[in-house]
Amino acid sequence: MKKIVVLALATIPLVAAPLAQPPNRSSKLAVYAAVGEELIAFGVDVDHATLTRQSSVTLPGFVQEAWASPSAPFLYVAWSNGGSSYTGSGVTPVGDKHGVTAFRVDPSGALQVHGAPASLRSRPIHITGDVPGRHLLVAYNDPSGVSVHTIDADGSVGAEVPQPGGLDVGVYAHQVRVLPSNRAVVLVTRGNQPTASAKEDPGAVKVFRYDASTLTNRASIAPGKGFGFRSRHLDFHPTRPWVFLTLESQNTLGVFRRDDDSLGELPLFSRSTLPGAGGVIAGQTASTVHVHPNGRFVYVGNRAGGTTDFNGTPVFGGGTNNIAVFRINQETGEPSLIQNIETRGFTPRTFAIDPSGRMLVVGNQNTMAVRDGTTVKTVPPNVSVFRIRADGELDYMNSYDVAVGRKPLWWVGLVALP
């Protein structure tokens, strides 16, 4: 297996690359799974819902998130040597190096470094690009923030674009997305739960006007002034004006109307992502959300990773790790829960759907000790593959272990190959 090591902020000759055609439903695909600082490429057979492990690259810090250009064969990978991705990994975080590295994606899915990495101000928690693929947008959680960076004509990461002062970036940003019109940006800010020593920080979805790479404040969507509103991730319906938002500690899927490049102040619908009544459950949280390419279904990750003691060993303490499947009413946008299916691993932080809508790939994040009668077994992080049926429900197909010590599987994505 080929493995490439990427140096932090090294000077690397730029390589001009031809533009690829936009991905389509028949494109060949690669799955990328980030385990610590290693980004592993898998070949994909969508017809049989199988993966084949191929090459990997190593970043200067743990991979946080990645984004594939819609118009050229490049993958932009955000990384950091600090932050919560290091928790429980056995690696001590330093927290002094953060960046984005551009890779050219070849037809096999192998990655080649393209240009010098761009240094970032702090740990990036999410990365995306604008609709034409001319700029990168990066979200930061602590302190909360957002930055915009040019993508140069050759596909390399360019300069950061200065922004006006006074941007309302909330508390603990978790995701940044560009609206389909390319005229607005949303920063999903989670806030923080109250503790014995600190008051609750409210959550909100911050909406910015986006004009030629410049952000200006437009709206703050914060039902109940953001208290009890732990907004984490959102996704857009492909053809209707609906936005689907996960509320992390509330284990809830909210549906908001998208209108005039902003969001409605209150949700149209709120539904539990759990099989029961849902609500706040200790150790149980929602993760990311993706709308099916046909717009008829929406999928949400449910995570549980708490532990309890068993003969001196911390073992899984209960809860559910599953994907919630909702059918979307095409007239109103109302989601109806039709399935919760276990992910065959622990803490499904991220997942992805292939462009044809036939396969869903889950990244089960954590290593977990599990009680097995009178003994304890260890379940490593893994990539689980599911078939998506015509009715939207999922069938489990395969799992692939990706253990590297106790490093987490922090991100998984599907990318169309050139």
Where are these regions (language model features)?
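Surface loop/turn motifs at the tips and blade-to-blade linkers of beta-strand repeat domains
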Residues: 56-60, 116-120, 164-169, 222-227, ...
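Residue-level detector of Asp-centered blade-edge/turn motifs that repeat once per structural unit
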Residues: 24-27, 70-72, 129-133, 180-181, ...
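Asp-box/WD-like beta-propeller blade repeats and closely related beta-sheet repeat scaffolds
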Residues: 111-180
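Signature of short aromatic-glycine-proline-rich micro-motifs recurring in repeat-based ectodomains
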Residues: 173-175, 231, 280-293, 348, ...
